Curated annotation (Swiss-Prot):
GO cellular-component term (any): cytosolic large ribosomal subunit
Gene behind this protein: rplR
Pfam families: Ribosomal_L18p
Keyword Secreted: no
Name of the protein in its database record: Large ribosomal subunit protein uL18
Amino acid sequence: MITKVDRNAVRKKRHARIRKKIFGTAERPRLSVFRSNKHIYAQIIDDTKSSTIVSASTLDKEFGLDSTNNIEAAKKVGELVAKRALEKGIKKVVFDRGGYLYHGRVKALADAAREAGLEF
């Protein structure tokens, strides 16, 4: 019997390989992205303390768009997370794409965060 490939399991394996190489510090924390079918989430994490410094998602009250699962929503989340990071004094981050391909919503979030002032 032919088994179907579980795309999320493959993504999790890919993310584990990426996480072996990427580590966020207090000087340069990790910008982690999680994407679901309906929403997109971004966190800036200090891995030395295992704590989230800043987060933003399409579930936030400040979000303000009707649709939450498209490229425009991802751009808005990228701008929000960058604005909140700059308020906390964070300018440089390490981008963690979460095992997702750098395309579509993930790329839109990253580009919007760069345009808003984050460096990676």
